[in-house]
Structure formats: structure tokens, C-alpha cells
Amino acid sequence: MRNEMNLQFSALSQNESFARVTVAAFIAQLDPTMEELTEIKTVVSEAVTNAIIHGYEGNPEGIVYISVILEEAMVKLTIRDEGVGIFNLDEARQPLFTTKPELERSGMGFTIMENFMDEVEIISNESFGTTIHLTKYLSNSNALCN
């Protein structure tokens, strides 16, 4: 059985933890392992932080959109912003690359997403924002939404 949740919130750094916890609570019905849940929470944190810091460049008037779809033992996340977009996506996906070194960012966001998720697709257009599609296949077959 398919179950879907949509969430939108202001691009404020304090909303990152709200997004992480809300997504984790929704996914809990699939009975993920603690490792899987931690990985998904980390990925949500990275993607939301990227939207706030890089997409909207700290402008709190921006909106971050999250969609979560649960199907059997699969989680599909979409995290989207309508910010400035990514100038060079290939460069941005390189480990340690950051456009904000003055903020002491590690530049590992996309690398973490690619390591923790089974599928990662990033679509970005300058001046039109970025959409990140993430898929995780859970190892536990005792999903409650089946």
C-alpha cells in the first residue's frame, strides 16, 4: 500500500531538525532498522541545509518542500527549493566542494546522500532551484503500511 506525506516550511535553519524528525516519524511505520532511520535523517538534514544555506542563501522567505512516499519497503524522498540553483552540478557533487567556505561547511552533503541512499537524482537549474530525488530500499520486510 502506498502512503504519502507532503511538507513545506520556511527556509530557516531551525526548521532543519523539524524536517528530520517529521520525516523519521512518518517513515517509522515501515519499521526501518536504526541504521536505516539514522541514514535517512542524516540525508534529510543535508538536503534541507543545502536548500537553506545554498539554495536560498539564508533568505528566510524561501520555502523548502519535502515529499515522502512509502511503498512496501521503499522510501522515496523529494526535497526541493526554488532558490538560485547549482551553477556546476558535477563540481558540487565532488567531495569537499563548498561554495561557502567561510561558514566552515564540509562540502560532503551530496557525498553523504550518495553513500546513504540507493538512488540519488539531482536536478538543478540556475535561478529556478534544485530538486533532489532520493530512494532507499529498507531491509526489513515487516512494514506496517503493507
Curated annotation (Swiss-Prot):
SMART domains according to UniProt: HATPase_c (SM00387)
Gene: spoIIAB
Name of the protein in question: Anti-sigma F factor
Superkingdom per UniProt: Bacteria
Recorded GO MF terms: ATP binding; protein serine kinase activity; protein serine/threonine kinase activity; sigma factor antagonist activity
Keywords: ATP-binding, Kinase, Nucleotide-binding, Serine/threonine-protein kinase, Sporulation, Transferase
Reactions performed catalytically: L-seryl-[protein] + ATP = O-phospho-L-seryl-[protein] + ADP + H(+); L-threonyl-[protein] + ATP = O-phospho-L-threonyl-[protein] + ADP + H(+)
PANTHER family reported in the protein's UniProt record: ANTI-SIGMA-F FACTOR RSBW, ANTI-SIGMA-F FACTOR RSBW-RELATED
Organism phylogeny: Bacteria, Bacillati, Bacillota, Bacilli, Bacillales
Record-listed E.C. numbers: 2.7.11.1
Protein family (similarity comment): Belongs to the anti-sigma-factor family.
GO biological process: asexual sporulation; negative regulation of sporulation resulting in formation of a cellular spore; sporulation resulting in formation of a cellular spore
Role summary: Binds to sigma F and blocks its ability to form an RNA polymerase holoenzyme (E-sigma F). Phosphorylates SpoIIAA on a serine residue. This phosphorylation may enable SpoIIAA to act as an anti-anti-sigma factor that counteracts SpoIIAB and thus releases sigma F from inhibition.
Family annotation (InterPro entries): Anti-sigma-factor_SerPK, Anti-sigma_F, HATPase_C_sf
